[in-house]
Amino acid sequence: IPLGLNEFLFAGTWAVPRYIGEGSLDRLLLRPLSTIFSIMAADVTLHGLGSVLFGLAVCIYSLVQLELVLSPLMVLFWICAILCGTLIQYALNMLMATLSFWVINSQSAMVLVQNISEFSKYPIAIYQKGLQLFLSFVVPYAFCSFYPSSFLLGVHTDLIYWAGPFLAAGVMLLISWAFWRFALSQYQSAGG
């Protein structure tokens, strides 16, 4: 679900290299709105809605099959965890897109990081410890699915399982925004 929401709401991150390369970022910098908001608002697509709907259907089917009844508090946690997962994916894409200020095209890095998200489709417990740490603390895709799911299913109730998605989303957003602001401070217009 977070991947679909990211594709729906934040497809604009994929346009950042183009804006920088073509010099059209200059036009956005002159607007009174946030540059990031302008980029995201320009490229909202319906592309990810299919993933969101399919993900919701799978979740509902799974809840029925497991005969799992979620309390209102757990439903609220689930919604917040989905939003946190979406923000984590956005922040990772934005970090890679921001590299376009220094390299010709950072879309290869964006694709690489998005491909790493494939690891989060499986429980991270099946991976070696190094990869578990990488997926938890370097490229924190584990907080998009594994940790929240483990908490919702009652498998794990440790602090990292319920608070981790919120912390990971907050930290990743702060890092990506700081990197973006640093890149903007170093930016020289395409004209000079």
Model-found features: residue ranges?
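Membrane-interfacial helix-loop-helix connectors in multipass membrane proteins
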Residues: 57-81, 150-162
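Hydrophobic alpha-helical transmembrane segments of polytopic membrane proteins
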Residues: 76-98, 167-176
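Hydrophobic alpha-helical transmembrane segments of multi-pass membrane transport proteins
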Residues: 1-54
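Junction motif at the cytosolic side of a transmembrane helix
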Residues: 167-192
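Membrane-spanning helices that line or support transport/gating and their immediate boundary helices
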Residues: 12-15, 19, 91-98, 102, ...
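Membrane-embedded alpha-helical segments of multi-pass transporters/permeases
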Residues: 8, 56-59, 63, 90, ...
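Hydrophobic alpha-helical transmembrane segments in multi-pass membrane proteins
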Residues: 47-59, 89-93, 137, 141-142
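Transmembrane helix segments
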Residues: 93, 97-151
